[in-house]
Amino acid sequence: MPTIQQLVRSRRIQIKKKTKSPALVNCPQRRGVCTRVYTTTPKKPNSAIRKVARVRLTSDLKVTAYIPGIGHNLQEHSVVLIRGGRVKDLPGVRYHIIRGALDSVGVKDRTQGRSKYGVKKPKSDK
């Protein structure tokens, strides 16, 4: 326990919380342009081909973002919206592309969990 004199001499320092998505710069989402769309493989126990994109943000930062869902229409120069959220088995991928926003279309034929993949409610046939 410090004395009052010690606290007068030098105040207590606040512990700063480190952000997990620094490229967003305190924004919920950021717009960017795809510079490269490619596939990569995950870390050791898992095996798959994951779709990712290198995105140049409006804040002039370059990040790697994951493309969720089955199938996509993204290519170089596509304008996308990214959000925070890492992919655990892909090192260096800390962002997700939001499906159904800007140039990224929603996942085709998706009926469950539609809001996460930018899919409108299907017309009910009677």
From Swiss-Prot:
<dbReference type="GO" id="GO:0009507">
    <property type="term" value="C:chloroplast"/>
</dbReference>
<dbReference type="InterPro" id="IPR005679">
    <property type="entry name" value="Ribosomal_uS12_bac"/>
</dbReference>
<dbReference type="GO" id="GO:0015935">
    <property type="term" value="C:small ribosomal subunit"/>
</dbReference>
<keyword id="KW-0934">Plastid</keyword>
<keyword id="KW-0694">RNA-binding</keyword>
<keyword id="KW-0150">Chloroplast</keyword>
<comment type="similarity">
    <text>Belongs to the universal ribosomal protein uS12 family.</text>
</comment>
<dbReference type="InterPro" id="IPR012340">
    <property type="entry name" value="NA-bd_OB-fold"/>
</dbReference>
<dbReference type="Pfam" id="PF00164">
    <property type="entry name" value="Ribosom_S12_S23"/>
</dbReference>
<protein>
    <recommendedName>
        <fullName>Small ribosomal subunit protein uS12c</fullName>
    </recommendedName>
</protein>
<comment type="subunit">
    <text>Part of the 30S ribosomal subunit.</text>
</comment>
<dbReference type="InterPro" id="IPR006032">
    <property type="entry name" value="Ribosomal_uS12"/>
</dbReference>
<keyword id="KW-0689">Ribosomal protein</keyword>
<dbReference type="GO" id="GO:0019843">
    <property type="term" value="F:rRNA binding"/>
</dbReference>
<dbReference type="GO" id="GO:0006412">
    <property type="term" value="P:translation"/>
</dbReference>
<dbReference type="GO" id="GO:0003735">
    <property type="term" value="F:structural constituent of ribosome"/>
</dbReference>
<keyword id="KW-0687">Ribonucleoprotein</keyword>
<comment type="function">
    <text>With S4 and S5 plays an important role in translational accuracy. Located at the interface of the 30S and 50S subunits.</text>
</comment>
<keyword id="KW-0699">rRNA-binding</keyword>
